């Protein structure tokens, strides 16, 4: 694995965390900030000095660079981890545009790792675009993997692979705490991720919806003293994009859409109640 040539497309929180992890493992890593024309060399000592992307941007250390197309053309592994700024229907267009830019200079026998959530069938579209742009054939002279990064503190246990083919070097790059990754088919990985997301949000929203009916102080106090007090805003926000991406897989009404829409509405409702409570507290205490 040592010396594997890796390019991470996107100086996002997730992208930098992955790049740092692999640089510390000894990979030859370049990370691409989409707002600049160059790929930045990320060495192990830099990754150890700057634990997150915010600290790197604040200090602005002098780092070696090379043109993006040169870095990508030499990459054995290209991780797609862009910053997404659009919302609603424009998200898919933005992702496809950036993905096309990222893969244009890829060469034969390289591998693409897609880290954004796609919902059901989204990876088939990505693979078609990959083959069209590069002129290469997935599973034959270029590889495609699906690794949705919903939570950096708990990376996926499985890697979706075209035809379920294993890649031991990639597994080593992504393995943390000696927990080896399992390779499954692309469609299987989409389903596993959907189950994880829906299970988490269904449980979370059940708690939020039930607790909102607690009116008296005794009940509120008892509920606050339980494990429910360990729920933070990050727990609600992380994975929300994954949930909405899953929802975009369907047209019309079905049981899964009820679960998805109910979870989204539950989170929105909690946010509104939280804002109202904060405003009420500020007003009550004459604070601004």
Summary of predicted features, one role per range:
Residues 2-288:
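Structural/interface elements that position substrates and couple domains in central-metabolism enzymes
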């Amino acid at each position: 694995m040592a010396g594997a040539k890796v390019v991470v497309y996107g100086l996002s929180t997730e992208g930098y965390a992955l790049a740092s992890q692999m640089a510390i493992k000894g990979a030859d890593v370049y990370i691409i900030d989409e707002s600049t024309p160059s790929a930045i060399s990320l060495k192990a000592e830099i990754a150890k000095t700057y634990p997150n992307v915010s600290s790197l941007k604040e200090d602005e250390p002098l780092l070696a660079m090379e043109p993006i197309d040169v870095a990508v053309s030499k990459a054995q592994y290209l991780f797609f981890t862009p910053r997404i700024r659009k919302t609603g229907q424009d998200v898919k267009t933005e992702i496809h545009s950036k993905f096309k830019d990222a893969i244009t200079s890829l060469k034969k026998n390289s591998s693409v790792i897609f880290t954004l959530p796609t919902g059901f069938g989204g990876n088939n579209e990505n693979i078609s675009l990959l083959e069209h742009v590069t002129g290469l054939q997935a599973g034959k002279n270029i590889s495609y993997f699906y690794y949705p990064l919903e939570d950096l503190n708990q990376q996926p246990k499985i890697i979706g692979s075209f035809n379920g083919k294993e890649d031991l070097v990639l597994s080593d790059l992504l393995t943390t705490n000696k927990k080896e990754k399992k390779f499954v088919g692309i469609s299987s990985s989409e389903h596993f991720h959907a189950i994880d997301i829906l299970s988490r949000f269904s449980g979370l929203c059940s708690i939020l919806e039930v607790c909102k009916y607690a009116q008296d102080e005794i009940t509120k106090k008892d509920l606050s003293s339980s494990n429910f007090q360990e729920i933070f805003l990050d727990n609600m926000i992380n994975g929300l994009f994954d949930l909405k991406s899953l929802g975009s897989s369907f047209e019309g009404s079905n049981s899964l859409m009820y679960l998805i829409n109910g979870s989204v509405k539950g989170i929105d409702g909690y946010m509104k109640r939280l804002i109202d409570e904060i405003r009420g507290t500020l007003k009550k205490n004459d604070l601004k």
